[in-house]
Regions:
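Extracytoplasmic/secretory ectodomains and luminal regions
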Residues: 1-246
Length: 246
């Protein structure tokens, strides 16, 4: 489709201009749902990757917390070798937390993109007035988009804030100010636990949506097969009727 317009210049015109052509693909409801199912599958795979990365962040924080806990009794040892080992551990922990902050921000951006893409899918289904799609729209709204929006606007920000505070405490430790990082570690891990639980709940809804899509497709296939059988029966009856008149 292309929009073309002309002005009312009677002296040197009319002048005609046109917009950029836009191509539209007309598909059946079944074809649209099949395309949507492919989109959902690809988005879900990306979401599973995000969830795995958030879990890895939690795992790394717990690992380094454990290492700091093990080294706690060495803090009073004045030996140069021990001081060097502790300094190396402290620096490695700061680096780990910095990497975790960057990773969580990347995960947040990806999850925001996933929320937007599911919103686009929902709008596409609604705007095309696909029949029998209301249960799917409700599942997308209530099970995926709404909780993802909460995760994006609240959970990720809370994780980010807690990790930034943890980094600050660890930097104070590196500067020999003897800050205790364990409470901050626990706050970050607790927030990650809560967010992972919510991400897993969204993933479960995505998997349910896939099951619903498969069930709807099976129903459509059955209806289509019945219609084809009815048409075949009608044609056979018509053929026999014509043969009987000859």
């Amino acid at each position: 489709m292309k929009v073309v317009a002309s002005d009312a210049d009677n002296l040197t015109g009319p002048h005609i201009s046109s917009g950029t052509p836009h191509s539209f693909q007309v598909v059946s409801d079944d074809e649209l749902l099949a395309l949507v199912a492919v989109k959902e599958l690809n988005i879900r795979r990306r979401f599973e990757q995000v969830l795995e990365e958030v879990k890895n962040t939690r795992r790394d924080l717990l690992l380094f917390r454990s290492r700091l806990e093990e080294a706690r009794g060495m803090r009073s040892d004045p030996k140069t070798e021990v001081r060097q080992q502790l300094a190396a551990l402290d620096m490695a922990t700061v680096t780990l937390v910095e990497r975790s902050i960057n990773g969580i921000r990347k995960n947040a951006n990806e999850t925001q993109s996933i929320e937007q893409e599911f919103g686009d899918i929902r709008d596409e289904l609604e705007n095309n007035a696909v029949p029998d799609v209301k249960p799917m729209l409700e599942r997308i709204d209530e099970g995926i988009i709404t909780p993802l929006h909460s995760i994006n606007t609240l959970d990720y920000n809370q994780i980010d804030d807690s990790l930034v505070l943890l980094r600050k405490v660890l930097e104070e430790t590196v500067l020999e100010q003897r800050a205790d990082p364990f409470a901050r570690f626990d706050e970050s891990v607790d927030q990650l636990n809560l967010t992972i639980e919510r991400l897993e709940a969204v993933l479960a809804q995505m998997l349910k949506l896939e099951t619903v899509n498969e069930a709807l497709q099976m129903l459509r296939d059955i209806i289509k097969a019945q219609e084809e059988l009815q048409e075949k029966t009608r044609l056979e009856r018509k053929k026999k009727l014509i043969e009987g008149l000859q």
